[in-house]
């Protein structure tokens, strides 16, 4: 197989013959290992170009990892439940991973609130970062685990994701966050009632719990300061995320990618969450906020600060992400040598 320069530095896939040899070549041009991939003709091999290497991902076309000749209940169930549409599979992947992420994040936030540690920035940064790490591991092999509508939209804007996929991913992310909010609320229902009673929304009070679900600014924060905070945080997040994803840059190994993203979120959150919570993720804020409105927190979750807050952590992460994406492209992305990919990513039969 001849050299194939990846057209997309973030998620290039090659449909190849199942009996092929993939040469792993590191950034120095050396060839440390060779790997032959052989499997059933019903399977597809996708070569995913990452930082200096080609990784093989096997996807079963109709047996979901089970032998066609088997006819036990597991094989029958797998064949019945398997979804042919890759687009649908990716949407389900994003939805489940977002549910996983938000379940961990909201559960940790609730525990911090109940134990009086809600104002500990290190603790909040820790559970934000590690929640996203494990969530990306859930979906990384299927959809990439973007888990952020603002970043998803930006990647589509940069031409690295189709607009149809963008719409499906974003819908799945909002949906997963909403369902996670409902589940965590039901799990902690008795604790919430015991802790807050009728005083749910008052974030200045001792027993308010609205801050478990959504972000709220400091009372002194101006409208201008709140907007700039959301834009700047998400801009930094996006620049860091794109640099981690770009195989032409110092991208971490595939298994370390979620950890790198989690450390990035942890650092940005720790640096800039004091004033307004550093949502950086529209689905992380608006989906739980909508759930709290439904279950009786009242319209104060939207009317807080005379309706001069709820739309800020929802709208301006999109602005910050777009700004970060454009900045990364202008300063880094467009300046790689055109033949860079050919020098470092090679397929051979």
From Swiss-Prot:
Aquaporins contain two tandem repeats each containing three membrane-spanning domains and a pore-forming loop with the signature motif Asn-Pro-Ala (NPA). One of its GO terms (cellular component) is plasma membrane. SUPFAM superfamilies: Aquaporin-like. Belongs to the MIP/aquaporin (TC 1.A.8) family. It is a multi-pass membrane protein. Glycans are attached at residues 194, 207. A motif (NPA 2) lies at residues 281-283. Its main location: membrane. One of its GO terms (molecular function) is water channel activity. Induction: Most abundant aquaporin in early embryonic state, adult active, and adult anhydrobiotic state. Expression is slightly up-regulated in early embryonic state. It is found in: Cell membrane. Aquaglyceroporin that may modulate the water content and osmolytes during anhydrobiosis. It comes from the Eukaryota. A motif (NPA 1) lies at residues 148-150. This is Aquaporin-4. The keyword Electron transport does not apply. Pfam families: MIP. Keywords: Cell membrane, Glycoprotein, Membrane, Repeat, Stress response, Transmembrane, Transmembrane helix, Transport. The chain crosses the membrane at residues 92-112, 125-147, 167-187, 225-245, 256-276, 314-334.
């Amino acid at each position: 197989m001849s050299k194939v320069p990846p057209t997309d530095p973030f998620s290039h896939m090659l449909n190849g013959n199942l009996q092929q040899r993939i040469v792993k070549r590191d950034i120095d041009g050396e060839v440390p290992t060779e790997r032959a991939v052989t499997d059933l003709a019903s399977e597809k091999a996708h070569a995913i170009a990452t930082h200096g290497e080609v990784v093989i991902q096997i996807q079963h076309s109709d047996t979901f990892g089970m032998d066609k000749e088997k006819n036990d209940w597991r094989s029958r169930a797998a064949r019945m439940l398997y979804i042919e549409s890759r687009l649908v599979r990716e949407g389900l992947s994003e939805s489940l991973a977002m549910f996983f992420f938000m379940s961990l994040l909201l559960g940790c936030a609730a525990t911090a609130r109940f134990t009086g540690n809600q104002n500990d920035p290190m603790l909040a940064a820790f559970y934000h970062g590690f929640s996203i790490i494990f969530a990306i591991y859930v979906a990384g092999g299927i959809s990439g685990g973007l888990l952020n509508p603002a970043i998803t939209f930006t990647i589509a804007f940069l031409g690295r994701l189709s607009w149809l996929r963008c719409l499906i991913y974003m819908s799945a992310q909002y949906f997963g966050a909403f369902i996670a909010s409902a589940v965590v609320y039901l799990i902690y229902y008795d604790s919430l009632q015991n802790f807050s009673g009728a005083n749910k929304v008052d974030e200045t009070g001792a027993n308010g719990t609205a801050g478990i679900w959504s972000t709220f600014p400091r009372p002194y924060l101006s409208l201008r300061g709140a907007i700039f905070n959301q834009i700047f945080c998400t801009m930094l997040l996006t620049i860091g995320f794109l640099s981690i994803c770009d195989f032409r840059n110092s991208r971490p190994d595939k298994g370390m990618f979620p950890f790198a993203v989690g450390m990035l979120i942890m650092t940005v959150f720790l640096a800039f969450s004091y004033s307004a919570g550093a949502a950086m993720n529209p689905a992380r804020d608006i989906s739980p906020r909508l759930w709290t409105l439904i279950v009786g927190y009242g319209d104060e979750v939207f009317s807080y600060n005379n309706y001069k807050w709820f739309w800020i952590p929802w709208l301006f992460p999109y602005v910050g992400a777009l700004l970060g994406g454009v900045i990364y492209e202008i300063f880094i992305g467009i300046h790689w040598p055109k033949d860079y990919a050919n020098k470092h990513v090679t397929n051979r039969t």
